[in-house]
Regions:
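N-terminal and secondary-structure boundary signal
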Residues: 1-240
Length: 240
């Protein structure tokens, strides 16, 4: 796929790229696309030289040794600051995702002073891309908007779903029995995150230049609703 510009139709570009490389979109494919290209297509790119830091941003910048303008962008994307540490700000974003730096990304963005926040409404972005692909391919698909996140107690990052459309993102297995007849009580599998992580093995995080991947052969449960909350409720979150 070419470099993304504001106004580009991501769904159309994915459809065309898949066809060109000999792997056209098929029924029940899962399309995983990085949040950076989605935000770029939506014009959600910020030049730090055009940002005036607030007093709060200046204060946090001193604590974290971050660029005050970058901190200001993070604050604008933040509903709640969860924790401030050495060179890191853990936040709950305006779309309720808990992550470092509100998901504001410097990587794979042209211009030394440009950064890319998460899409304003990731689920809506996923829905729009899905509709574009389905219209062109005449195939039912699911779409995930992904981002790279760190995890408590674990080294290294993985991809997670920050937005989804067309399927149930969590498989609830409570009430099912295991091999020995034990009834599962808390087992809920984060399907969307697992698919996003699998796709990252192809997409990469550096200079691969692959903004989207097709996951083929997974038997997901189709669903038009987007009511499933992927973030744990604050009162049940042991880390907050």
């Amino acid at each position: 796929m070419p470099f993304i510009q504001p106004g580009d139709k991501i769904g159309k570009m994915i459809f065309q790229a898949a066809k060109k490389q000999g792997t056209p979109i098929q029924q029940h494919d899962v399309i995983v696309v990085t949040h950076v290209v989605v935000s770029k297509s939506e014009g959600n790119v910020v030049n730090l030289d055009e940002v005036k830091p607030s007093e709060k941003a200046l204060e946090i910048a001193k604590q974290t040794n971050k660029d005050p303008a970058m901190v200001e962008v993070i604050l604008r994307e933040t509903k709640e600051i969860v924790r401030i540490g050495q060179n890191s700000i853990i936040t709950q974003t305006n779309s309720d995702i808990v992550c470092a730096n509100a998901g504001v990304d410097r990587s794979n963005v042209s211009g030394d002073r440009n950064v890319v926040p998460l899409p304003k409404e990731p689920n809506s972005s996923a829905s729009r891309i899905r509709k574009e692909i389905m219209h062109l391919s005449d195939a039912e698909v699911a779409v995930i908007v992904s981002d790279t996140h760190g995890r408590p107690f674990r080294m290294g990052e993985i991809n997670i779903a920050v937005g989804y459309a067309g399927f149930k993102p969590i498989r609830d297995r409570r009430g099912e029995k295991d091999l020995f007849g034990y009834v599962l009580r808390i087992k809920q599998t984060a399907i969307a995150d697992e698919l996003a992580s699998a796709a990252e093995l192809v997409i990469g995080q550096a200079n691969e230049g692959i903004p989207a991947a097709i996951v083929r052969g997974y038997n997901y449960t189709s669903d038009e609703e987007q009511t499933t909350q992927l973030m744990r409720a604050k009162e049940k979150d042991l880390f907050r």
